[in-house]
């Protein structure tokens, strides 16, 4: 690893560690669930290693991988690494991807029987950079909880290649994926969707 790459990787490691603490403090990555990544260059990505507690990450828990998910210098990356690399390939402007296992995202992915959650008329949708009014309707797709990650990654790729809604996705009974042009933006998008999912679940309870 050359000096410039090492410096950039080290910066992303610190971003991921801080993001892990934030996500854990909100209860969105219990136990060793979830994963976090950040783009280092057009060739490499920094990502959490498999089975690490996101609230207690150390620099040794963050791996450098290529865009095919292969680690550079050893270590076992997250089992869902290909979902991260798929997002980076789909959206070149993305510089961070966050995957959470929160109660709200998990529950809404189960109770919603369609293959998407439709969100509209929420002021907080303006947390996304291309949305400037609450008078909008977006879809967050729900994919089956497929253990064959290459197959799931292909399903995600096929969906977003033709969809105008590019804000995140759910895996049924599993959790949420969001992303952003920076780690800060990815965390903002996560928080916005978490709030809206909580509102949706409360509305469902009122209507039941």
Swiss-Prot record:
Q: What is its EC number?
A: 4.2.1.109
Name its co-factor(s): Zn(2+)
Q: Which InterPro entries match?
A: Aldolase_class_II_sugar_metab, Aldolase_II/adducin_N, Aldolase_II/adducin_N_sf, MethylthioRu-1-P_deHdtase_MtnB
- EC class, as a word, reads lyase
Q: Which Gene3D superfamilies match?
A: Class II aldolase/adducin N-terminal domain
Query: What task does this protein carry out?
Result: Catalyzes the dehydration of methylthioribulose-1-phosphate (MTRu-1-P) into 2,3-diketo-5-methylthiopentyl-1-phosphate (DK-MTP-1-P).
Name of the featured protein: Methylthioribulose-1-phosphate dehydratase
Q: What is the lineage of its organism?
A: Bacteria, Pseudomonadati, Aquificota, Aquificia, Aquificales
């Amino acid at each position: 690893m050359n000096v410039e790459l090492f410096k950039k990787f080290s910066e992303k490691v610190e971003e991921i560690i801080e993001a892990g603490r934030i996500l854990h403090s909100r209860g969105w990555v219990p136990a060793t669930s979830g994963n976090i990544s950040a783009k280092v260059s057009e060739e490499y990505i920094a990502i959490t290693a498999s089975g690490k507690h996101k609230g207690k990450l150390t620099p040794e828990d963050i791996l450098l991988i290529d865009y095919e998910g292969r680690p550079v210098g050893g270590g076992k990356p997250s089992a869902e690494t290909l979902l991260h690399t798929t997002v980076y390939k789909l959206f070149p402007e993305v510089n961070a991807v966050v995957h959470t296992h929160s109660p709200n995202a998990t529950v809404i992915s189960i109770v919603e029987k369609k293959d998407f959650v439709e969100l509209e008329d929420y002021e907080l949708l303006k947390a996304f950079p291309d949305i400037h009014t609450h008078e909008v309707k977006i879809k967050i797709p729900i994919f089956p909880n497929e253990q064959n990650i290459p197959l799931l990654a292909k399903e995600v790729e096929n969906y977003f290649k033709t969809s105008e809604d590019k804000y995140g996705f759910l895996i049924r009974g599993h959790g949420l994926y969001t992303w952003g042009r920076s780690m800060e933006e990815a965390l903002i998008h996560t928080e916005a969707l978490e709030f809206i999912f909580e509102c949706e679940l409360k509305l469902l309870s009122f209507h039941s």
